Amino acid sequence: MLGYLSIPPVVVYLRARYSAARYVDLFAAAGLAVVVIGSIGAASMATAAPALISDYVTASGAQKQALLPAFATLYRAVVLGMWQTLESIPATVWLLGTASAARREGPRPVFVILLVLGVINAAIALYRLVGS
């Protein structure tokens, strides 16, 4: 979860740096949505997964078979649902939107980094929405 808490200063800095750009507030809101979605997923996984793992270690054979679907559901909901699908959509909006602002006003390396990360996130979102 610490990784998600390091994103808001970057979002706020880039919003302030490119404040003259159109829709920069929308892009910043999308960046903060990434933090909220990711933190909820991280807190859910950090709270539920250790208990399931501990129960699995001490469980009998039949109990282990009963715990597997619970852990698989948690994994699918958080990792595939929240982190790889739901989170990648606002991340794409934030990164590509901020890249468009950086293209006009900022240094070229910042634009390229934001653009590459945005395209990667867009590909992940598209794959998750269409491919699987």
Question: Could you tell me what each predicted segment is?
Answer:
Residues 1-132:
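Hydrophobic, aromatic-enriched alpha-helical segments typical of multi-pass transmembrane helices
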